[in-house]
Amino acid sequence: MNQPSIPPIEDVQNTPDTRQLAIDKVGIKSIRHPVKVKDKTGGVQHTVATFNMYVYLPHNFKGTHMSRFVEILNNNEREISVESFESILRAMVERLDAESGHVEMTFPYFVNKTAPVSGVQSLSDYEVTFIGEINKGKYDITVKVVVPVTSLCPCSKKISDYGAHNQRSHVTVTALINDFIWVEDIIRMVEDQASCEVYGLLKRPDEKYVTERAYDNPKFVEDIVRDVAAQLNIETRIVSYTVESENFESIHNHSAYALIEKDKRK
């Protein structure tokens, strides 16, 4: 039995648009896909990433082809690797015939940490994002890492007869790189500049240590971003960066915030 003929379906996205307005980024957002990531210990972490995928749309096209973004993800191996990140981006730009493209891949990354006194080990998680961009064939990759730390207020310590208010802070480094850099290296640059780093598991001797460590190393939010920026300045694999710190104030119902941006090429 012959299959019934299917009438042609109009491709509305390819119809002209007359408003003379190009779109800088259009695509899909918040699609999840399994990924695998190598870590500095030689292991491989299997996790799930959230992808944002965009292309540039010229002024004369009405729309892009949204389904093709999903097809590009699914055409890759079941677990996408960081090594295949550039090829996915290039495939997206080619498939959609775009001048430029942008892909973000955000996932939890785990580091095994050792408590400072007892030596007990536990996992700490960090939010990591790889941001890839292609513009007229040129590929750039940016690494973004959110690092939780402890900050202790120098003013509170100075004016108080005992104690000082302290809190957890999120330090975010967004770095355009020119060579491979381990996520752990960025984490270490941040944690070394905090009042104290945080741990998943602490025993009582460890808790005493981190409390006293933070008290002996007070930092304003301004101190944290300046000290981290000083480390990023001397890291040759980093071309430009933004470092932000948000301190979730324990004595206020608001956060303290600071940011430094630098492009070393200028």
Curated annotation (Swiss-Prot):
- Site positions (May be catalytically important): C153
Entry EC no(s): 3.5.4.16
- One GO molecular-function entry: GTP cyclohydrolase I activity
Q: Does the keyword Hydrolase apply?
A: yes
Which keywords annotate this record?
A: Hydrolase
Q: Which Pfam families match?
A: GCHY-1
Pathway stated in the Swiss-Prot or TrEMBL entry: Cofactor biosynthesis; 7,8-dihydroneopterin triphosphate biosynthesis; 7,8-dihydroneopterin triphosphate from GTP: step 1/1
Name the catalysed reactions: GTP + H2O = 7,8-dihydroneopterin 3'-triphosphate + formate + H(+)
The UniProt entry's GO biological process terms, in alphabetical order, are: tetrahydrofolate biosynthetic process
| Entry-linked InterPro entries | GTP_cyclohydrolase_FolE2, GTP_cyclohydrolase_FolE2/MptA
Question: What does the protein in this record do?
Answer: Converts GTP to 7,8-dihydroneopterin triphosphate.
Protein family according to the UniProt entry: Belongs to the GTP cyclohydrolase IV family.
* Family annotation (HAMAP family): GTP_cyclohydrol_B
**What's the protein here called?**
GTP cyclohydrolase FolE2
The organism named in the record is: Methylobacillus flagellatus (strain ATCC 51484 / DSM 6875 / VKM B-1610 / KT)
